[in-house]
């Protein structure tokens, strides 16, 4: 069983359900639209393996409390930071606090390569397995590093490699990430300030 918020894109659940796990949905906080950390412990059973906090719209979950719960029950924390590139929680980048962090570079994101994403891994022992899954189930990454004289199929995997053209397109954006973020924040502030009067009149909620 994997605990996640009831409000998230279907990919969050798909990643686990397609591999035989059960998604356990927990309600969200109305102020952040993120998982309500106060409800997580009630959802934990002897089958629970991980908590998946989703940082909706780049707004951080209450990670200190979630990490404390995970430590108490010996659970993995897999951050869905698909919308959280360049966002932070108490000075720490979203996606870097759990055991794994997931970024998305889908075309709707602030930094895009059309599709694809990035997996951040805390424990080095998990890197090799991630490389195998990424490389169609082979140890090809080791071959490219000269660690083996030939590569072979070792377990089930798929193809998660972007084209060099798409990677270059993304890399150029990441080089300018601070400037891109600054411009987007300027646009956001313009909307926030401009809609303030309507909010004060009770015509909208912001």
List where the protein language model places each region:
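Conserved active-site segment immediately N-terminal to the catalytic lysine
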Residues: 79-113, 142-144, 149-154, 205
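PLP-dependent aminotransferase class I/II
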Residues: 38, 42, 50-54, 59-65, ...
